[in-house]
Design a protein with these regions (language model features):
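Hydrophobic Val/Ile/Leu positions in short beta-strands of Rossmann-like dinucleotide-binding domains
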Residues: 190-192
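Glycine-rich Rossmann-fold phosphate-binding loop(s) that bind the pyrophosphate
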Residues: 194-196
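N-terminal functional module of multi-domain proteins
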Residues: 1-61, 73, 77-86
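N-terminal Rossmann-fold NAD(P) dinucleotide-binding loop
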Residues: 199-200
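Glycine/serine-rich phosphate-binding loop and adjoining beta1-alpha1 elements at the start
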Residues: 47-185
């Protein structure tokens, strides 16, 4: 529970397979512990199928994302989560939480090198030089603005790699399915449940 607002949140780590776990931070009115538990399990399945070979995790905060105190809540959230985020848990943006404009700078304000620092340390187990190199690459690549019109829906919107990468992965997975099993994606219909971080980019 937050000290200054009615915000309440949970971090769920389904397992520390491979030495680490990861999953984004979401915020909305009505987030529950059971929802975060289910999402952490789903992240575990995602990583099992697509890699890296780590455990699933998730952060969820029951709070109105339109409240003007949102950034203060996120600041206290990441300050409280710092021991995990520095050692074996990694996070990012999710529903109503922007990776580039909120997660990365707020983590850095709390002396967390990057929101995935815990995954780099827990899973990759590099020496300090190797850890610094990976963090540097992530810090440069995730907020990088995508300018190739074949990779972004609207160049003028200045979407970052972090905004688009999950949806891009879903779209590529569909193309690969048809390459492996035959058929053609043309003429196929899709059902989109929600229009969040994944579907919006896909």
């Amino acid at each position: 529970k937050d000290t200054d607002t009615d915000a309440e949140g949970w971090i769920v780590i389904n397992s520390l397979r491979g030495g680490a776990a990861a999953g984004g931070t979401r915020m909305r009115i009505g987030v529950t512990k059971d929802e975060v538990l289910a999402l952490a399990k789903t992240m575990e399945i995602k990583f099992t199928v697509s890699g890296p070979p780590i455990g699933g995790g998730k952060s969820g905060i029951n709070f109105n994302p339109r409240d003007p105190r949102k950034k203060e809540v996120l600041n206290r959230w990441y300050a409280a989560a710092k021991p995990l985020l520095k050692t074996y848990y990694g996070t990012g943006g999710d529903m109503n939480v922007d990776e580039v404009h909120e997660v990365i700078p707020i983590c850095q304000d709390n002396e967390i090198l990057f929101p995935l620092e815990g995954v780099v340390k827990g899973h990759h187990k590099k020496n300090q030089e190797g850890t610094d190199q990976i963090i540097k690459q992530l810090s440069k690549g995730v907020p990088l603005i995508v300018t190739n019109e074949k990779l972004t829906p609207i160049v003028e919107k200045k979407y970052s790699v972090g905004d688009l990468i999950t949806g891009y992965g879903v779209a590529e997975a569909i193309f690969h399915y048809y390459n492996i099993y035959g058929g053609d994606v043309k003429g196929k219909r899709v059902i989109i449940q929600g229009w969040g971080n994944v579907a919006g980019a896909a």
